[in-house]
Structure formats: C-alpha cells, structure tokens
Amino acid sequence: MPSTKTQVSRRLTILSTEEIDSLFGMPHFTEGERQIHFELSPVEQATINSARTITASVHLMLQLGYFKAKAQFFVVSLEHVRPDINHILTRYYPGRVMSEVGQLSKPTRLAQQRIILDLLGYRQCNGDEKQALISLAQRSAMLSTQPKFILREVLEHLSNQRLVAPGYIYLQDLVSQAVTDEHKRVTSKLNAALPANLQLSLHTLLHADDKIHLINVLKHEANDFSNKEL
C-alpha cells in the first residue's frame, strides 16, 4: 500500500512515539533480557555454528535475539549494539573481541533473515497476506472505527499467523484507509435511507459542541491497548 500525498494528509495519529518504539523499535536489553533472548536451542546453535565468519555468526545471533523479542528485523549500527555484541562474545566466543566483528553486506543480511524465519516458523507479510490484512481492517472498522482497536486486531492477526508485521507507516495507512472507507460506507447508507431533514438533524447532532451533547462527550480514543479502554 504505497503512500500518496492524499494518504499522508489523512493519515491518522494512532500511537504515541513511546508506543511506536515499544512495538516497532529496536530492543534495548537489560543484562537479564540478554540472558533470555540470546539463549540458543540446539538447532539454533547448530545454525550459528555453520556461519563462516565471526561477523556472520554474531550478526545472526543478534538478529535472532532481536526477532525473538520483537518479531522484527533491524539494520544495526555496531556501536549502537556494542553491549549486546560484548555479551555474545563473552558468552559464546571467549577470547574474541569487538574489533573482529564487521558490518554485514545487504545480501548476507537478507539471507540471514530468511534463515531466522525458517528457524522460528515465521513468514514475511506479502501479496495475499497483505490483501488479507486489508480485509481484516475493513471488517474491524465495521465494529469500531477507533484506530487503536483496528490496529490491535491487525497486530493480533499477524502474531497468530506468525507473520512479520509491515512497518508502522504501512499499518497507519492501512488503518486510516479502513476508517475512511467505513465512514463513507455508513454515510452512503444513511443518505440512501434517511429523509433530508433527518440527515441534517443527525449531522448537527454529531458535530455539535462537545460540552452540550453527551454523544460527543462519550466519543474518545482509547488511551492504550487494554480491553477496558478498547
């Protein structure tokens, strides 16, 4: 779903900066979290051992640990992830040092992503999967046009189907389009079913001063992803 100027202009603000980082940003592990996310199963260990260089091994382990935490892939700066690399070297490659680890080429990075998807039973969200997301967002919007509700339904579907989530901007456009389409659908049905005088009264009610009309007092965005708020 490529973004156009029209899409950008009607793109809804769904999550705060902190929420976006929590869901889609690179993990920032504590030492305890490193112990958990960089733990390797026998199959994972064998896969890491098959890498030809220390650079390839460390990057594969990094991305595997990050994917376990976020189900996302990241392009990393070595200096930015130095604490994670030091943990991996100390734990799995005693005697090796940070200066031995270089950057990966893009083809190798993409090849490692495919390896991780196979190891963990995930798939990229492409083609038919994205069409299914569009349909799901449209159905969800028929239940509620609150953007956070629709986004949560989409993210739950991706998790249940073990699909790598598209980027946040894509999901933002997806939800925004679903809300716009649902508003148009409901408006069209109302225009077809209601006399002109009732249409005018309804329009006035929905756009009146919030301080006067309870219907607008009750209309608000959910504060978070809890069931109570949604």
Spans of features found by a protein language model:
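Long amphipathic alpha-helical coiled-coil/heptad-repeat bundle
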Residues: P2-L230
